[in-house]
């Protein structure tokens, strides 16, 4: 197999020429005139308005006039970053919020109510759930299930449909609490 020849590469610049090239551009990191680094497929062409590249009236042109990076339009971008967590911006007082001026406007409350800003608080919700005597339906539950000490009286459910599981297996997992008719148990046999 024939060997490939090395492609002709330009000779490396001497130190003086490199130093001269850098001195023409002020600093090595100063590249305002060049396009931003990165794959061209992701960066895309510079914004154009009326067929003129770099027109300051372009809808996508943002930032200082020297920068040429393409920016995301404001409607498709994320909300502005938070400016701070202090209460200074919102003023002093009980209704001032830590949000200050931001996504929701000047001194506007956030869309989700916090504690003390309307809506049920967590504390009252959990207290109500833990204390069943305060529940509205407790009176119904208390009258439906008699206390364990009293003699059990079976309710006649013969007017209800027959429990499918009881008719197939002979027993039901809900036993006395089943809403359907168990022949011979909670009513006359069939």
From Swiss-Prot:
Keywords: Metal-binding, Zinc, Zinc-finger. SUPFAM superfamilies: CCCH zinc finger (SSF90229). Residues 1-94, 110-130, 142-161 are annotated as: Disordered. A zinc finger (C3H1-type) spans 157-185. Residues 37-48 have a biased composition (Pro residues). Gene3D superfamilies: Zinc finger, CCCH-type. Pfam families: zf-CCCH. One of its GO terms (molecular function) is zinc ion binding. This is Proline-rich protein 3. It comes from Mus musculus.
